[in-house]
Swiss-Prot record:
Keyword check for Nucleus: no
Species whose genome carries this gene: Pediococcus pentosaceus (strain ATCC 25745 / CCUG 21536 / LMG 10740 / 183-1w)
A Gene Ontology cellular-component term: bacterial nucleoid
PANTHER family assigned: DNA REPAIR PROTEIN RECO (PTHR33991:SF1)
Record-linked Pfam families: RecO_C, RecO_N
Protein name per its UniProtKB record: DNA repair protein RecO
Xref: InterPro entries: ARFGAP/RecO, DNA_rep/recomb_RecO_N, NA-bd_OB-fold, RecO, RecO_C
Gene from which this protein is expressed: recO
Keywords: DNA damage, DNA recombination, DNA repair
Family from the record: Belongs to the RecO family.
Main function: Involved in DNA repair and RecF pathway recombination.
Length: 253
């Protein structure tokens, strides 16, 4: 049975898609109802009053008809803002888009994921405020892996549990190996010690308690390459938004 309820909800606009000549399908990440697709009639008309409230990266409180299955509908925007810097800056936009794409891939639609709504909202706030977008994205990537069914031990050796020796990532062992056990996997990643330490921190720290982390461009790239490999070979996804960031990095060289 497809139940319908008129309700207020907190949401973040993930993306929009054209539907027919004048309509849009707009996907929201909501606090109360998970990821939902909303049908917005006449949204492409120039005089549509809610247009600014349904642009990508708009966020706030809305009211509408929430259907348990199929498309939902928005009646009004009650208190909506825009992540202005993300919306206007191509680099921030790219990382924020990738973060939202990851969440879209990790969870089914119409399933309540309140804790992840809160984390993603915090990530976007931090990115919009000028914090290191790549580090915030790495944190989300690493912590989302469990939601894809990938459990990795990041903070100690999977064989002996030691934390006092340099660690390196081993796909074969599903986590870190300490220096005493590196010979067990000749195909380990050969991470630099600082990269391994930063990954351990990002895997465990709450995004609500994340402070300033000073990381070199080389270290960030090493972490980025590792997560790309894990998502491609273990999760089985290679998002276009990641490829765009890779291309964007080449522009900076």
């Amino acid at each position: 049975m497809n139940t319908v309820a008129n309700a207020d909800f907190n949401g973040i606009v993930m993306f929009e898609r054209s539907h027919r000549e004048n309509d849009l399908l707009v996907k929201f990440l909501t606090k109360e109802h998970g990821k939902r697709m909303f049908f917005i009639r006449n949204a492409k008309k120039v005089d549509f009053k809610l247009r600014s409230a349904i642009l990508p990266f708009s966020h706030g409180q809305y009211t509408g008809l929430i259907r348990s299955n199929g498309l939902s509908y928005i009646n009004a925007a009650l208190d909506v803002q825009q992540f202005e810097n993300i919306f206007q800056d191509i680099t921030l936009n790219a990382y924020a888009t990738f973060v939202l794409n990851l969440v879209d891939a990790a969870f089914d639609d119409n399933v309540k994921i309140t804790s992840w709504f809160e984390r993603i909202n915090r990530a976007l706030i931090l990115i919009d405020a000028g914090n290191d977008a790549e580090i915030i994205t790495d944190l989300i990537q690493i912590q989302l892996l469990n939601s894809f069914g990938i459990s990795i031990t990041w903070d100690h050796c999977v064989i002996c549990g030691r934390t006092d020796l340099p660690l390196d990532y081993s796909e074969a062992f599903g986590g870190m190996l300490c220096q005493s056990h590196w010979e067990r996997d000749e195909h380990r990643w050969h991470l630099k010690p600082k990269s391994a330490r930063i990954i351990g921190i990002l895997s465990a720290v709450s995004i609500f308690k994340l402070g300033q982390i000073s990381i070199s461009k080389e270290t960030k790239q090493e972490i980025w390459n590792l997560t790309a490999d894990i998502y491609k070979n273990q999760v089985g996804i290679n998002l276009k938004s990641r490829s765009f960031i890779d291309q964007m990095k080449k522009w900076e060289i």
